[in-house]
Amino acid sequence: PQSAAAGDLAPRQLHFKAAELRRYQLKYGKLMTQWEEQMAFPEAWFPTPENRKAQSAVFALERARRYDIAERIVSAFDEVLIWARRDIRLELDIKHAVTVIQLDKRRITPEEYVRERDELATLKLESFRTGGDAYADMIHNSVLASRISRCRMILNRYEIQDAEPRMPMELHVIKMGSIAFASNRFELFMDYMHRIQARSPFEQTFIVQLAATPGMDGGTYLATERAIANKGYSASLYDNLISPAGGQQLVEETVRILKEIF
């Protein structure tokens, strides 16, 4: 399977939780109850029966969401196959271009550096917990370790950004007849995908995100100017290694290669 640009998408909407739950209860009926009963959380994680029941309900809801998504994918595939099978081609002109492009990093400002430095100093005064509630200790220690790591990452990026202002990315572009596929390493915001598709000479252009670069650095978000200005989880300095200018460079380089192999 491949994933198109989806860095600014999530398969849920937070403003109609009650309606969503009612829909799944009507759709899946007794399955929802079975899913709740199947998930037996350890008592050490959730000491009270009420907590365990609440978490089991969350598990059932998440499972229903995934069932629903899977069913919609199957339905969409079956519908498309009805008419797509009318144009099955056994011979195609295939080309594969690979190159490494350089993209502008998102710079850390002096103010952001000072803020993260001070935050790191404060976090170092906080102790990791042991000997208490196992689940609560795990959550606390995981959050603390993550926050310390994030601060250190920002400080390191600030220290090397002048010497290394750009980051390499392996770009693959494939021609298959009248359609094309173009990869990127990011959780890419949809705007960039649309910019590429609108200028591509191909009849249809597929964007494949999270490709060619393994590891945590390969999957960082590539947010737009508007997203960074309005802030948010996927547009924070912790989650963006590349700037919006770098995102546009990705667009330009991808379009250039698409035109070359067309």
Model regions and ranges:
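Non-catalytic substrate/cofactor recognition surfaces at enzyme active-site rims
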Residues: 1-262
